[in-house]
């Protein structure tokens, strides 16, 4: 039974590799963060909103970064849908990109700044 659960977890992790995972519940958020922490993976979070124009501009760039850095976990959180998570990390402007590793916030990028986001993903993914 434990082997099946481990296989299911490994399969789920592999499915998300190279893709942006949209988080729609606190339970899903907790599961994604716990799995990434256990695997000591970099987590890059895009705090976004459906009404945010710059967020829509950054979405394909964020998706490309997820493909280029499949060892990291890329999460997308709608601040209106999951307000408690946005508040927990003091997100006040969109887009805000947060970099976490083993439960600690390592860095952030506030705004639609492609060059800074790309540079910081490369920097933190290498650590």
Curated annotation (Swiss-Prot):
CDD domains: TRX_family. One of its GO terms (cellular component) is cytoplasm. Keywords: Cytoplasm, Disulfide bond, Electron transport, Redox-active center, Transport. Transmembrane segments: none annotated. The record marks 46 as: Deprotonates C-terminal active site Cys. Disulfide bonds join 52-55. Residues 2-127 form the Thioredoxin domain. Coiled coil: none annotated. PROSITE patterns: THIOREDOXIN_1, THIOREDOXIN_2. It comes from the Eukaryota. It is found in: Cytoplasm. Belongs to the thioredoxin family. Plant H-type subfamily. This is Thioredoxin H-type. It comes from Triticum aestivum.
């Amino acid at each position: 039974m434990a082997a099946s659960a481990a296989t299911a977890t490994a399969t789920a992790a592999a499915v998300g590799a190279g893709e942006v995972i949209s988080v729609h519940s606190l339970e899903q958020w907790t599961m994604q963060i716990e799995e990434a922490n256990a695997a000591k993976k970099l987590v890059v979070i895009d705090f976004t909103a459906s009404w945010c124009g710059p967020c829509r501009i950054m979405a394909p760039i964020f998706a490309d970064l997820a493909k280029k850095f499949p060892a990291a976990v890329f999460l997308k959180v709608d601040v209106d849908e999951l307000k408690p998570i946005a508040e927990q990390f003091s997100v006040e402007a969109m887009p805000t990109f947060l970099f976490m590793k083993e439960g600690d916030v390592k860095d952030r990028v506030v705004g639609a700044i492609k060059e800074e986001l790309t540079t910081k993903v490369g920097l933190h993914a290498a650590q």
